[in-house]
Swiss-Prot record:
Residues 1-39 are cytoplasmic. Belongs to the X(+)/potassium ATPases subunit beta family. The C-terminal lobe folds into an immunoglobulin-like domain and mediates cell adhesion properties. It comes from Mus musculus (Mouse). Residues 68-290 are extracellular. The sodium/potassium-transporting ATPase is composed of a catalytic alpha subunit, an auxiliary non-catalytic beta subunit and an additional regulatory subunit. Interacts with isoform 2 of BSG. PROSITE patterns: ATPASE_NA_K_BETA_1, ATPASE_NA_K_BETA_2. This is Sodium/potassium-transporting ATPase subunit beta-2. PANTHER family: SODIUM/POTASSIUM-DEPENDENT ATPASE BETA SUBUNIT, SODIUM_POTASSIUM-TRANSPORTING ATPASE SUBUNIT BETA-2. NCBIfam families: Na_K_ATPase_bet. InterPro entries: Na/K_ATPase_sub_beta, Na/K_ATPase_sub_beta_sf.
């Protein structure tokens, strides 16, 4: 014979819960006395305090082996990559000459990007260096901080400097300037004591034909050795990255042109198919005319 348990009323269930939370007869809170709660809280306090102390100690020991200025370990990729300015989505530089808004955003980005390169700012912060040789600043046992940097003046960008330029870097006339910059790599040397230079080509035969003529600033797209080596963000506080400006003069209008620019130096490999940005950058250029 099955004996059915008596079903508790709602009031009984509530009373049982109230007694579980606080039992006035045994002076227990949620099944434990005050002493029991004190011991268990003390245990967890000591336990997590010990874990925190161990973690803090290991972090402190690790940080003693790390320099504040130069990373102990660097990326296996020693070849600097290239990027373009103005910075655009998918590296597409599209200019509609008749639509001021389409190229106005590029002009605003370039104005902001080139502001630190103004000659007055460079003269105030950086040194006039001797071209053709590395600007090395060894510590020689004593921390040489901060490192000095060489001037890269905006006027070196010639027709792409944007100084007193009514064409807005050429975007209003369909002759846009695109700026090539090399990513920073700490203690990078170009090798062979020869200045680097940037070259740009159309990726395919039809691209080369549609690309037309272009000029580079500084001349021949050169990047002088005096801007190297780079010692890191904390060491080289006022470091100014050298730029190469490419002014495209007669791109075939209304056609998408695939352009690839490379940095040429003795120890920079630009043929690594696993990294499309190692020493090179590819972008699309389109000049729309109505």
């Amino acid at each position: 014979m099955v004996i059915q348990k008596e079903k508790k009323s709602c009031g009984q269930v509530v009373e049982e819960w109230k007694e579980f939370v606080w039992n006035p007869r045994t002076h227990q809170f949620m099944g434990r006395t005050g002493t029991s709660w004190a011991f268990i809280l003390l245990f967890y306090l000591v336990f997590y305090g010990f874990l925190t102390a161990m973690f803090s100690l290991t972090m402190w020991v690790m940080l003693q082996t790390v320099s504040d200025h130069t990373p102990k370990y660097q990326d296996r990729l020693a070849t600097p990559g290239l990027m373009i300015r103005p910075k655009t989505e998918n590296l597409d530089v599209i200019v509609n000459i008749s639509d001021t808004e389409s190229w106005g955003q590029h002009v605003q980005k370039l104005n902001k990007f080139l502001e630190p390169y103004n000659d007055s700012i460079q003269a105030q912060k950086n040194d006039v260096c001797r071209p053709g040789r590395y600007y090395e600043q060894p510590d020689n046992g004593v921390l040489n901080y901060p490192k000095r940097a060489c001037q890269f003046n905006r006027t070196q960008l010639g027709d792409c400097s944007g100084i007193g330029d009514p064409t807005h870097y050429g975007y209003s006339t369909g002759q846009p300037c695109v700026f090539i910059k090399m990513n920073r790599v700490i203690n990078f040397y170009a090798g062979a004591n020869q200045s680097m230079n940037v070259t740009c080509v159309g990726k395919r035969d039809e691209d080369a034909e549609n690309l037309g003529h272009f000029v580079m600033f500084p001349a021949n797209g050169s990047i002088d050795l005096m801007y190297f080596p780079y010692y890191g963000k904390k060491f080289h506080v006022n470091y100014t990255q050298p730029l190469v400006a490419v002014k495209f003069l007669n791109v075939t209008p209304n056609v998408e042109v695939n352009v690839e620019c490379r940095i040429n130096a003795a120890n920079i490999a630009t043929d690594d198919e696993r990294d499309k940005f190692a020493g090179r950058v590819a972008f699309k250029l389109r000049i729309n005319k109505t």
